Amino acid sequence: MKLLILGNHTCGNRGDSAILRGLLDAINILNPHAEVDVMSRYPVSSSWLLNRPVMGDPLFLQMKQHNSAAGVVGRVKKVLRRRYQHQVLLSRVTDTGKLRNIAIAQGFTDFVRLLSGYDAIIQVGGSFFVDLYGVPQFEHALCTFMAKKPLFMIGHSVGPFQDEQFNQLANYVFGHCDALILRESVSFDLMKRSNITTAKVEHGVDTAWLVDHHTEDFTASYAVQHWLDVAAQQKTVAITLRELAPFDKRLGTTQQAYEKAFAGVVNRILDEGYQVIALSTCTGIDSYNKDDRMVALNLRQHISDPARYHVVMDELNDLEMGKILGACELTVGTRLHSAIISMNFATPAIAINYEHKSAGIMQQLGLPEMAIDIRHLLDGSLQAMVADTLGQLPALNARLSEAVSRERQTGMQMVQSVLERIGEVK
């Protein structure tokens, strides 16, 4: 069985890395003989962080070349591509409409040829199909249809759907893939509300729950050992932060208000006698355009006792982060996957909602009270919630352990079911 896993943006986002690692770990357990290739927009850093070979994404390279085309002709082509390219691809796939006879860029033709060497294509999960990210997100899927290969989308959150062209492509792609397996039910409700077809929808989990703890073969690096030692010295709460853009406008807030409010939460945690470690699931490795460490450093100016506020500047992979989060008492995460990684390594987590996916994931876990709307951060009420949670850790840990093991079991069944279907097609 030869599989291609595509759709990873970069493992520089350790959430995307955990999603990919969990899927790979599950496939390795369920079908150790499967031949699996992985593709990412940023293959060099992703390969290092995952500790396995990773191929570059040719469609991303093509898009970068097109976008950097010089001169008036280059700019005109860019505008035309942005407006019509996905309609042309869709016409090619459906073999209908006037646009079907227009030549597509060589990169698409080459990519279709590459896909034909696989038994099936898996579009790895995450929050990939979001209207704000635009229609290029559907290119891989349309090429898979052209290559006439099975396409399974595993562990996704989808939507919102507030753009007509995006919705048209979503309807076609989600209706023609072999399965769109959602990781939470809020996305399903959004699809129904926006009249997006749900015929191929199945309910699953986020594949980051499937990351193996690698208890037998994990060796802590110098940096990881340092942070494990720091966490062992005093009771520790971990936090993760982010630059809110592009969601700040939709949320009606500012980065400054968010940072000030989060500093208030950190100060309350320090008052409760804990130290705080700020970990970052997104760093600027390999030119990735988000670096949460800068937000963590910026927060320091508002912290009452900076000596007990530690910012991790090291480049850690998601598994190493899991080990450090596992040594903490609680995680308060703006990044959803810091919460998932934390809980997978047996540390309870509060996830701050700035998108529907966090509420959906916590709801599914049976811990809806652990997803806190960002409004509660901004109005200061999260401070008391965190203090209450710290007072209820033993009871919470028992519920968490049961919920995570249930989620992992569902996740393994989800991957098994996909592998069985691919085996039948093959």
Swiss-Prot record:
UniProt xrefs under InterPro entries: Colanic_acid_synth_WcaK (IPR023918), Polysacch_pyruvyl_Trfase (IPR007345)
GO molecular-function term, one example from the UniProt record: transferase activity
Pathway: Slime biogenesis; slime polysaccharide biosynthesis
Transmembrane parts of this sequence: none
EC category: transferase
Entry EC no(s): 2.-.-.-
Keywords of the record: Lipopolysaccharide biosynthesis, Transferase
Any one Gene Ontology BP term: slime layer polysaccharide biosynthetic process
PANTHER family: COLANIC ACID BIOSYNTHESIS PROTEIN WCAK (PTHR36836:SF1)
Family: Belongs to the polysaccharide pyruvyl transferase family.
Protein name as annotated: Colanic acid biosynthesis protein WcaK
Organism per entry: Escherichia coli (strain K12)
Phylogenetic lineage: Bacteria, Pseudomonadati, Pseudomonadota, Gammaproteobacteria, Enterobacterales
Gene label: wcaK
